[in-house]
Regions:
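Glycine- and Gly-Pro-enriched alpha-helical subdomains that act as flexible
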Residues: 176-199, 205
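Conserved alpha/beta cores of soluble small-molecule-handling proteins
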Residues: 1-169, 174-176, 204, 214-283
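Secondary-structure junction motif
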Residues: 208-210
Length: 283
């Protein structure tokens, strides 16, 4: 037997999980999702993720399927039933089921699915040595602030980057980096400023980004929220990206150009340690 998953009110073996043919998440990508990191059995930044889930649902006019305490209990139950120590817990809320039509009945009831994934999140080779990211045009729609399940643009960009020998990809629009395909992009200038995009409809508001920003403020580190070009990124002193599944990930090559000496820099190392310490994990 595989994992225990949550589908529309029931905990069932993954082999028995069923999602309706006419679910709008399946037919239209009319759904939102969240992924929360789990380290040593504890959810990390989950309050930020659930707040973002509520915001995304509100932007699409989809009702929250359960109260926040009930969602937290659901997540904890998935972690417990699957004996998850390190990995992620995934939530997916679709608008619901109805016969296929672009217009939907206002009476639809949202559908909630949840599952866990085992994954080593700390001390990985990539976190020790850094990754190389490609640069490509941003193929996505213009409401990237909503964490929608429509991810084909990101899938295509990541697949193309891998085929070119890169580990990941940063997206570019109008001559400026928007974000990573599944992460928030950051660069560090020679004078120690941490640059990252300000919140807007062009980017997803990152939960790990927000948590890290709080830590930086407490430490007196300078964060400048502004857009930067691929060229500025390639000539930065350091670079990194953040996400729930990669935490603080050093970037040592951008679009084929080495960043610094090609190794994770001291500021990035400090940020990794700060984040893990705040999460209660030995650095």
């Amino acid at each position: 037997m595989g994992r225990i998953v949550y589908v529309h009110g029931d905990f069932v073996p993954e082999e028995e999980a069923r999602i309706g043919l006419f679910d709008r998440g399946f037919l239209f990508g009319d759904a939102v999702y969240e992924v929360t990191a789990v380290i040593a059995g504890r959810m990390i930044d989950n309050d930020l993720h659930l707040a973002r889930l509520e915001r995304s649902l509100g932007e699409l006019g989809i009702a929250l399927p359960l109260s926040r305490p009930d969602i937290e209990a659901l997540q904890a139950e998935l972690i417990s039933r699957n004996r998850l120590t390190d990995g992620t817990v995934y939530l997916h809320v679709s608008r619901g089921e109805a016969d296929r039509d672009f217009l939907y009945p206002e009476t639809m009831a949202p559908k909630l699915v949840g599952f866990t994934q085992m994954k080593t999140l700390t001390g990985t080779k990539a976190q020790r040595e850094g990754i190389a990211v490609d640069l490509t045009g941003d193929p996505r729609w213009h409401r990237r602030d909503i964490k929608t399940a429509m991810l084909l643009g990101q899938v295509m960009a990541k697949q193309a980057a891998r085929a070119r020998g890169f580990d990941d990809v940063w997206l570019v629009e109008a001559g400026l980096v928007t974000e990573g395909a599944s992460s928030t992009a950051h660069v560090i200038t020679a004078d120690g400023r941490i640059l990252t995009r300000a919140a807007s409809k062009a980017t997803l508001p990152g939960c790990t980004q927000r948590a890290l920003a709080r830590l930086c403020e407490a430490e007196g580190l300078r964060i400048e929220e502004r857009a930067f070009s691929p060229e500025e990124a390639q000539h930065a002193a350091e670079a990194f990206q953040t996400s729930a599944s990669s935490l603080v990930m050093p970037v040592v090559k951008i679009g084929g150009r080495m960043i610094g000496d090609g190794r994770p820099g001291p500021m990035t190392r400090r940020l990794q340690s700060l984040y893990l310490e705040a999460a209660g994990v030995p650095a």
